[in-house]
UniProtKB/Swiss-Prot annotation:
Known glycosylation sites: 89, 98, 151, 156, 199, 345, 360, 378, 396, 450, 470, 556, 689
Region spans: Cadherin-like region 4 (CLD4): 407-508
UniProt name for this protein: Proto-oncogene tyrosine-protein kinase receptor Ret
Residues the record lists as Phosphoserine modifications: 697
Organism: Mus musculus
Catalytic site: 875
Function: Receptor tyrosine-protein kinase involved in numerous cellular mechanisms including cell proliferation, neuronal navigation, cell migration, and cell differentiation in response to glia cell line-derived growth family factors (GDNF, NRTN, ARTN, PSPN and GDF15). In contrast to most receptor tyrosine kinases, RET requires not only its cognate ligands but also coreceptors, for activation.
Residues marked Cleavage (site): 708-709, 1018-1019
Residues that coordinate or bind Ca(2+) 4: 268, 566-567, 569, 571, 576, 586
Positions of region (Cadherin-like region 1 (CLD1)): 29-153
Effect of deleting the gene: Exclusive loss in nociceptors results in a reduction in nociceptor number and size with a reduced epidermal innervation, but increased sensitivity to cold and increased formalin-induced pain.
Membrane topology, from the record: Single-pass type I membrane protein
Residues at which ATP binds: 731-739, 759
Encoding gene (name): Ret
Length: 1115
């Protein structure tokens, strides 16, 4: 206290020392404008007056002296010519033409100016006779005169309009300093016109009367100020005049002119205390951080804010204190703000100076002091008398200590299903939310070492502690139903402590985690998959969906969150920052695709539609929601309900009639309705009608009719002349049909020959197989998509039925992928060899992950089209995808596809062998085939693509697969498969069909993966060490075929299930006999050859024992 008083007592001495530093601004003449404009014409006579420049005085008695610069310059300050064309009267400031200028003068300057047709030059005019450098021309002691040099003669006097004679070409404004003697600052007349057109009379008169400080001479040629102006009273004026033009005739025209006049400021106003307050009191308690503003005092100055370069020199502030602790702890910061004040109904600029007393360092919670501080403020440019520019500000400061206190006890509930990093509550010392510069550390001391399920982390924003789940296993222990802790809060600087008890009650029951759920809730893009999964930070074990408002780019965007209470909220808190998977919407420093507004340092501040993130790949997407408004109102829904009710009644009546008819009518022999997984022996074909029901087979009368006797109606649109078709080598064959390579002449109007593939029946085929071929023919007529095999035509008359379809150069996708594995890096470099017949000449480059994703995307687009056409494929697999030139994917083998315009599912209740490992659960157990069961198969196809043609579920026999799938077992992620691709597979393998994505959504997800895919897939490195993945001991084509009696069948069938018997892609070069003779297990011999390595076919074909198991399920 004594030190502060003694410091204030020395104020008088300091003021005396500072007074000699006060000075006055230099005085001098100045120009009223910083630029003048006029026109020059070719052949203007020498001596033509051009314009006046005017100088105003700083003090009475000053006489101006004008001097021209030595050179003419271009607008880009290029020196063009020595100035011998323009002269000036050094006393009056009149500029006139020294010599007449011709076209050569203009051309000479134009060339030096870069050849621009519009030539503008300028020269500089200085005040005073002393020499100045031309590069230092600045207002107020120098001005520039610009001339538009026109390559034409002076216009005819009769061509001028009144506006041309009154209004200058360029806007004119004036600058007048306050408190200066009156003087002339403008000459109205355009001197060249007055000189060259004496018959035109132009006169002026001022408007506004005596209220304005301007006047004209008797002829009103020159305008002057009437008195010294005061900027603090009025800063801007408008000079208005009336221009009267009279020509040789009697007509007169008037034009009104206006010019702005700005009064420039000088430092003639002393600073004063704002509101008369020069003392401030402050208390330093909870805000103790360096940079904290302790108190503020304001100083008002009627003068304008100085330029930034002048501010530090003009205004100084000094902390007057002899206390070293105060000097080290506090500093003063000065910040001026321009403000407007009203004076006589005029807005005038002024300055409000803010002087802030700021902590120069952080203070500990134990610091305690009381002191008085004085700050000297000096306006060093003040032009008034004495020490009017000096003020002293006073600050009374009290620094108080801080005591740490916690409440006696805390109590929180926690859900047993909570995931790691789930936030359950906060602990906070008293007033912690007001702390700044105080560092508190929280710790938990558990009462039992077996129940340490919680952790605590200190929030740097409000010095609170956030409690979170750190060990989910401890939550599930029976003895940990009530967690007891001691919370200890410690000040890091002084080590002072306080503590309280904490009781956390564990509630709820455990739940089974969904298969295939991502680690982060933010990955989920759709509400159903969000709410059925959990993720890091979820307090309930399930993610929460936040539905946005859908209004453009908004902070309330739709997203999946562990807890909408904390995520996303635009702030990455202390818990969320521990793992990017908790809340990437707030914390991820990622690339954001789509409409968004990025957070200040991280996360998404605002987004468009639905925003989801992939933390491992550091990417976020904000895309529109796939939603539509209500399509039907209440009346519409009532009508639809009534119609559906009527339809249901009609269907029930129809079913009753049909059942009654079958009960009393003749029953033809039909196949068994039991679902078995074996194939009838050769010669007993299985087929379906277009409605999806089993046709009569085996002993059906129509199947005994020769194919040749069946008359096919001709379709002129698709009929192709048989003579124009030349058949070639066989590409693949099945039991009753084959595919051959062919050339077609003038196909679809094309010139020359076109390579095609032709599907046909073998001689042993029956009408059942012919109907299958006709069914595919009729189906292919309806489809047209770049990723579905294309029908060109058919030969249906005067011979066997031939279907002409698109030729796929590289065969099946499965063979293409496997052969790509064999290629390896050596093939890319040209050193490899190929023996496979599946690929003749593929692109000579190694497959990249982008290629594989592209294959999947193409297939998904084709399946999306088929789904929109209401077609179910039922056998989607890599073996049934063909690869055309340019690596174009083509969906083929529609022998099983069924038109579902009438019904969305096909129930298969017939005998026949099926591809178990590609089938959906509902197809295996309930015989239901829908577009969503195709989605399941597509997931297996994705697995085949990523593993380059691997066999699904390697090493697992089909009879075990049923129970594994039912209990939630799914294939594991292959080594070279991305997390995002594997998540898509798992979504396709959801047990409930309605929770699987549709093909449209799958296409969108694959499009994103294609954009993000950059790295090459190392085919050699991706080869699994387990040979089962690719061979299972045998290739799929070499698997044994057995009938219902376990009798082996000939290996002439394709590598698809038996209903695809017509168009398989088996190798035509297979040997006719087995290299190793085999006997049956029962010791009986067969008349059919087998192969030694024919066991893996069971990997996707169910054995008779499994068939019996499925019969049990049926019953």
């Amino acid at each position: 206290m004594a030190k502060a008083t003694s410091g204030a007592a020395g104020l008088g001495l300091k003021l005396i020392l500072l007074l000699p530093l006060l000075g006055e601004a230099p005085l001098g003449l100045y120009f009223s404008r910083d630029a003048y404009w006029e026109r020059l014409y070719v052949d203007q006579p020498a001596g033509t007056p051009l314009l006046y420049v005017h100088a105003l005085r700083d003090a009475p008695g000053e006489v101006p002296s004008f001097r021209l610069g030595q050179h003419l310059y271009g607008v880009y300050r290029t020196r063009l010519h020595e100035n011998d064309w323009i002269r000036i009267n050094e006393t009056t400031g009149l500029l006139y033409l020294n010599q007449s200028l011709d076209h050569s003068s203009w051309e000479q300057l134009s060339i030096r100016n870069g050849g621009f047709p519009l030539l503008t030059i300028f020269l500089q005019v200085f005040l005073g006779s002393t020499a100045q450098r031309e590069g230092e021309c600045h207002w107020p002691g120098c001005t520039r005169v610009y001339f538009s040099f026109i390559n034409d003669t002076f216009p005819n006097c009769s061509s001028f309009k009144a506006q041309d004679l009154c209004i200058p070409e360029t806007a004119v404004s004036f600058r007048v300093r306050e408190n200066r003697p009156p003087g002339t600052f403008y000459h109205f007349h355009m001197l060249p016109v007055q000189f060259l057109c004496p018959n035109i009379s132009v006169k002026y008169s001022l408007l506004g009367g005596d209220s304005l400080p301007f006047r004209c001479d008797p002829d009103c040629l020159e305008v002057s100020t009437r008195w010294a102006l005061d900027r603090e009273l009025r800063e801007k004026y408008v000079l208005e005049a009336l221009c009267i033009v009279a020509g040789p005739g009697a007509n007169k025209e008037t034009v009104t002119l206006s010019f702005p006049v700005t009064v420039y400021d000088e430092d003639d106003s002393a600073p004063t205390f704002s509101g008369g307050v020069g003392t401030a009191s402050a208390v330093v308690e909870f805000k103790r951080k360096e940079g904290t503003v302790v108190a503020t005092l304001q100083v008002f100055d009627a003068d304008v804010v100085p330029a930034s370069g002048e501010l530090v020199r003009r205004y100084t502030n000094t902390l007057l204190s002899g206390d070293s602790w105060a000097q080290q702890t506090f500093r003063v910061e000065h910040s001026p703000i321009e403000t407007l004040v009203q004076v006589n109904n005029n807005s005038v600029r002024a300055t409000m100076h803010n002087y802030k007393l700021i902590l120069n360092r952080s203070l500990s919670i134990s610091e305690s002091r009381v002191l008085q501080l004085a700050v000297l403020v000096n306006d060093s440019d003040f032009q008034g008398p004495g020490a009017g520019g000096i003020l002293v500000l006073h600050f009374n400061v009290s620094v108080l200590p801080v005591t740490l206190n916690l409440p006696r006890a805390y109590s929180f509930p926690v859900n047993k299903r909570a995931r790691r990093y789930a936030q359950i509550g906060k602990v906070c010392v008293e007033n912690c939310q007001e702390f700044s510069g105080v560092s508190i550390q929280y710790k938990l001391q558990p009462s039992s070492i077996n129940c340490t399920a919680l952790g605590v982390v200190t929030s740097p924003e409000d010095t609170s502690g956030t409690l979170f789940v750190n060990d989910t296993e401890a939550l599930r222990r029976p003895e940990c139903t009530k967690l007891q802790y001691t919370v200890v809060a410690t000040d890091r600087q002084t080590r002072r402590q306080t503590q309280a008890s904490l009781v956390v009650t564990v509630e709820g029951t455990s739940i089974t985690e969904e298969v295939g759920c991502p680690k982060s809730c933010a990955v989920n893009k759709r509400r159903p998959e969000c709410e059925e999964c959990g993720g890091l930070g979820s307090p309930t074990g399930r993610c929460e969906w936040r539905q946005g408002d859908g209004k453009g780019i908004t902070r309330n965007f739709s997203t999946c969150s562990p807890s909408t209470r904390t995520c996303p909220d635009g702030h990455c808190d202390a818990v969320e920052s521990r793992d990017a998977n908790i809340c990437p919407q707030d914390c991820l420093r990622a690339d954001i695709v789509g409409g968004h507004e990025r957070g200040e340092r991280q996360g998404i501040k605002a987004g468009y539609g639905i925003c989801n993130c992939f933390p491992d790949e550091k990417k976020c997407f904000c895309e529109p929601e796939d939603s539509q408004g209500p399509l039907c109102d209440a009346l519409c829904r009532t009508i639809i309900t009534a119609a559906l009710f009527s339809l249901i009644i009609s269907i029930l009546l129809s079913i009753f009639c049909v059942c009654h008819h079958h009960k009393h009518g003749h029953k033809p022999p039909i196949a068994s309705a039991e679902m078995t997984f074996c194939r009838p022996a050769q010669g007993f074909p299985i087929s379906y009608s277009s409605s999806g029901t089993r046709r009569p087979s085996l002993d059906s009368t129509e199947n005994q009719v020769p194919v040749d006797s069946f008359k096919i109606p001709e379709d002129p649109k698709w009929e192709f002349p048989r003579k124009n078709l030349v058949l070639g080598k066989t590409l693949g064959e099945g039991e009753f049909g084959k595919v051959v390579k062919a050339t077609a002449f003038r196909l679809k109007g094309r010139a020359g020959y076109t390579t095609v593939a032709v599907k046909m029946l073998k001689e042993n085929a029956s009408q059942s197989e012919l109907r299958d071929l006709l069914s595919e023919f009729n189906l292919l007529k309806q489809v047209n998509h770049p990723h579905v095999i294309k029908l060109y035509g058919a030969c249906s008359q005067d011979g066997p039925l031939l279907l002409i379809v698109e030729y796929a150069k590289y065969g099946s996708l499965r063979g293409f992928l496997r052969d790509s594995r064999k290629i390896g890096p050596a093939y890319v470099s040209g050193g490899g060899s190929r023996n496979s017949s599946s690929l003749d000449h593929p692109d000579e480059r190694v497959l990249t992950m982008g290629d594989l994703i592209s294959f999947a995307w193409q297939i998904s687009r084709g399946m999306q089209y088929l789904a929109e056409m209401k077609l179910v494929h039922r056998d989607l697999a890599a073996r049934n995808i063909l690869v055309a030139e340019g690596r174009k994917m083509k969906i083929s083998d529609f022998g099983l596809s069924r038109d579902v315009y009438e019904e969305d599912s096909y129930v298969k209740k017939s005998k026949g062998r099926i591809p178990v490992k590609w089938m959906a659960i509902e197809s295996l157990f309930d015989h239901i085939y829908t577009t969503q069961s195709d989605v399941w198969s597509f997931g297996v196809l994705l697995w085949e693509i990523v593993t380059l043609g691997g066999n699904p579920y390697p090493g697992i026999p089909p009879e075990r697969l049923f129970n594994l799938l039912k209990t939630g077992h799914r294939m594991e992620r292959p080594d070279n498969c991305s997390e995002e691709m594997y998540r898509l597979m798992l979504q396709c393998w959801k047990q409930e069909p309605d929770k699987r994505p549709v093909f449209a959504d799958i296409s969108k997800d694959l499009e994103k993966m294609m954009v993000k895919s950059r790295d090459y897939l190392d085919l050699a490195a991706s080869t699994p060490s387990d040979s089962l993945l690719y061979d299972d001991g045998l290739s799929e084509e070499e698997t044994p075929l057995v009938d219902c009696n376990n009798a082996p069948l000939p290996r002439s069938l394709p590598s698809t299930w038996i209903e695809n018997k017509l168009y398989g892609m088996s190798d035509p070069n297979w040997p006719g006999e087995s290299p190793v003779p085999l006997t049956r297990a029962d010791g009986t011999s067969t008349g059919f050859p087998r192969y030694a390595n024919d066991s893996v076919y069971a990997n996707w074909m169910v054995s008779p024992s499994a068939a019996k198991l499925m019969d049990t399920f049926d019953s």
